[in-house]
Amino acid sequence: DDSRLSFLQGNYITLTNMKLPDIERIIQMHLAPINISVQTTNPELRCKMLHNRFAGEKLKFLDILYENHIEMNGQVVVCKNVNDGKELERTIDDLSKFLPFMRSVSAVPAGITKYREGLYPLELFTKEEAGQVIDMIESRQKKYYEEFGLHFIHASDEWYILAGREFPEEERYDGYIQLENGVGMMRLLINEFQEALEQLRRSQEYEQMKKSFSRTVTIATGKLTYQTISKFAETLMEEFPGLTVHVYAIRNDFFGETITVSGLITGQDLIGQLKEKKESGVKLGDTLLIPGNMLRSGEQVFLDDLTVEDARRALEMEVTAVESGGQDLIDAILNVDYAMERENDNFVYIQAYKKDEK
């Protein structure tokens, strides 16, 4: 835990290695907001989940931060049969006492990789269970909003995708406070895409593009966003008859099929699965578009050390990283010269290979 990174970069901290002088320093310097991985407000359960005998007693720091008007955001990684159900309800109710200085809490389902030998046997949530989590959270949002002007508790996008439900309207996200936790990313993307499309329709070039534009491109994404990106592609192909967009959800063989986010897709999985498509006769087009978060921050390198150039050579096509945004997606599909302008500096680097021991 490093409270400086929480303040500067938005990292979430558990408070487990912090002492009272550390909290007093935060208060004195008014370092806010402080983002806290709470997981549960049950002290005994928190010790168990974090494998730290001090984790429960560190919850007292929330009271001190609240009393000194330090703005906070909370996170609960929800594990089935551990801190869900009544435990999750208790956690939300307990944390709501820190309103309005705790401005938001996100509930995110635990990501479960295939590398779990010797670890607690976590299970995936079902569609029905995801719906129950959403219902419980949404039933509390109205009360908090009426009293504090904040919806406070938010279910991450994964719950809505798993439950097969529409994403909430933009107003429910309170200005996208928890975007880095996957709360509202899809709603923001959908709204940006729709706004960019309307702007394109009003442009002087639109009618001429409808008649003359011709291109075939492929988009690779994670399973989590596949349906949404596919709908975008269908919409653009209806707008431009000469446009063909193939959208493929890359299966995560490296970490396991239960990992569905694009940011944890390795180069080997991307290349291997798209080569299979090519070998089966699918014409992928002139360019492969990939989300910028597939690459390490500021680099053209995947998690497993394969590079964008490796993918270009293997697939024999241009590979372009796309900034996460509706306008950028449309620009990348319709503009062969598109280049991502900003570095993908919001991605946390995870090394997806083992170094040889010597």
Spans of model-derived segments:
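Conserved Radical SAM active-site core
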Residues: D1-F101, G111-R140
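Short glycine-rich or small-residue beta-strand-to-loop segments that form or flank ligand, phosphate
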Residues: Q75-V77, V105, I290-M294
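Structural preference for beta-strand elements that scaffold enzyme active sites
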Residues: P33-N35, E71-N73, S104-S106, F152-H154, ...
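Auxiliary Fe-S-binding modules of radical SAM enzymes
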Residues: K97-F98, G111-K358
